[in-house]
């Protein structure tokens, strides 16, 4: 039997394997938490009138209707250092995909050699025999068991997971920029309110001094009024420091040096308000939108594909090879006898020791189970975070409404106290108490507004919007 016949018979035996690909085909497991209909329902904590069931817009920060904020987010998404690092990670993952694809392509090798035989003694070098060889070798992996295809599938899924991680950075950056800008505006509003209360207290202090000078007041009253002024004034440096910290954070997020912080933001008089009910969507939309969920799902797909990569190790690896070359002395290099060529399959098979391959398959299956557990955990965390953020936002809005009413009542009481004191109906301690209550109400309301901004940012961060504001991968869970 000729070598050609043996090779042909071997190919005929192994060609049916081309219809099979090792390992399981990936699909979202039926027992995954994300596949449960209960995970797709409307949010339990999203029934307040301040929320709507509309799909959140991707550029959710535009709901505030502030062009300056929109410009800051755009700049940050273009220049943020964390995003630049995430983009580099994505390029590296894409290069890995190209590497895996190249493994299934034709490989070419060229070799050349020359020899010079030299006999010992007094033999002249010019008389030494010389020979040369030049060869071209081509090889193409047939990938009958599908190991290379599964490797490409795993590399693609890993690259998509890295893209999702990049998208998560975009979400975090957009939320951080919005939070920092709104904090600057909130601090400015609090500063204005504090200075307004301080102006009232200083006017009271001056009036008290005049009364004491005219014999209608005491030094004790002057001291108490001065203490109230100093107590309110002491809060201003802290507010200024907090505002500056937010401005510097904003600069860093935008990729600027501290000296180049956006000074125009210092003039924001108060935080912009949402112009409509906050759209939150439902659970199904959330899981489709959140990049961390997508990254976990793509990691599960990659782990599933790796089972096929390891399963392919149970089967022979067939490479179709072809070689052509020329060899001989310089005088005979162009003769017919110096040429040679061959073509045929090359078989590589780790057999009979299959226990190692089966152990690797078992390990790959365990990795897939780990990836599924991680995916389920991230889905549960996404739903929990969103429900928690919705509840916290609802309660903080209610708290702010109550504190706003309390501030109005305190301002009215402070004005009435001054009038009553002027007519001798109450003593000076009551005036100071009313003004202290107003200062406390202003402080509590400012704190609540800052908390409400933080709660809204946590909610938007939980909803996962903002990653599609630039080029990105498809966000759908497979």
Regions found by a protein language model. Name each.
Residues 85-100, 169, 173-210, 227-232, ...:
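Amphipathic alpha-helical coiled-coil segments
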Residues 7-10, 211-217, 235, 256:
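Amphipathic alpha-helical interface segments used for oligomerization, scaffolding
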Residues 107-109, 219, 249, 260, ...:
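Residues at or immediately flanking beta-strands
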Residues 78-81, 384:
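Surface-exposed, polar/charged faces of alpha-helical domains
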Residues 22-25, 59, 65-68, 72-75, ...:
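Small/polar-residue-enriched beta-strand and adjacent coil segments characteristic
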């Amino acid at each position: 039997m000729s070598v050609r016949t043996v090779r042909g018979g071997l190919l005929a035996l192994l060609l049916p394997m081309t219809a099979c690909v090792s390992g399981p085909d990936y699909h979202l497991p039926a027992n995954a938490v994300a596949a449960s209909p209960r995970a797709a329902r409307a949010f339990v904590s999203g029934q307040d009138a301040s929320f709507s069931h509309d799909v959140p817009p991707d550029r959710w920060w535009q709901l505030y209707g502030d062009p300056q904020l929109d410009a800051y987010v755009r700049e940050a998404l273009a220049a943020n250092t964390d995003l630049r690092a995430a983009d580099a990670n994505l390029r590296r993952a894409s290069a890995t995909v190209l590497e895996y694809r190249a493994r299934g392509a034709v490989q070419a090798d060229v070799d050349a050699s020359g020899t010079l035989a030299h006999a010992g003694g007094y033999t002249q070098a010019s008389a030494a025999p010389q020979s040369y060889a030049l060869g071209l070798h081509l090889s193409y992996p047939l990938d009958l068991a599908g190991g290379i295809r599964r490797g490409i599938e795993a590399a693609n899924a890993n690259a998509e997971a890295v893209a999702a991680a990049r998208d998560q950075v975009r979400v975090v950056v957009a939320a951080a920029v919005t939070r920092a800008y709104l904090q600057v505006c909130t601090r400015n509003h609090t500063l204005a309110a504090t200075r307004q209360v301080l102006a009232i207290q200083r006017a009271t202090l001056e009036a008290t001094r005049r009364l004491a000078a005219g014999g209608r007041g005491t030094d004790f009253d002057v001291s108490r009024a001065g203490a109230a002024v100093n107590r309110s004034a002491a809060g201003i440096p802290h507010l200024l420091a907090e505002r500056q910290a937010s401005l510097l954070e904003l600069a860093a997020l935008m990729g600027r040096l501290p000296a180049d912080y956006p000074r125009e933001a210092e003039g924001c008089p108060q935080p912009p308000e949402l112009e409509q009910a906050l759209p939150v969507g439902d659970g199904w939309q959330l899981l489709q939108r959140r990049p961390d969920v997508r990254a976990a799902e793509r990691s599960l797909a990659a782990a599933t594909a790796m089972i096929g990569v390891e399963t392919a190790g149970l089967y022979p690896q067939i490479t179709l090879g072809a070689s052509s070359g020329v060899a001989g002395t310089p005088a005979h290099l162009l003769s017919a006898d110096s040429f040679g060529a061959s073509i045929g399959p090359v078989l590589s098979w780790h057999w009979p020791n299959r226990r190692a391959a089966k152990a690797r398959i078992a390990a790959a299956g365990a990795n897939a189970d780990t990836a599924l557990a991680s995916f389920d955990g991230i889905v549960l965390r996404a739903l929990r975070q969103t429900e928690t953020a919705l509840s916290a936002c609802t309660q903080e809005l209610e708290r702010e409404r109550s504190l706003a009413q309390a501030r109005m009542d305190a301002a009215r009481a402070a004005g009435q106290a001054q009038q009553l004191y002027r007519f001798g109906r109450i003593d000076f301690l009551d005036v100071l108490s009313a003004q202290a209550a107003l200062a406390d109400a202003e402080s509590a309301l400012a704190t609540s507004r800052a908390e409400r901004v933080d709660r809204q940012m946590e909610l938007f961060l939980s909803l996962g919007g903002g990653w599609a504001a630039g080029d990105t991968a498809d966000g759908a869970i497979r």
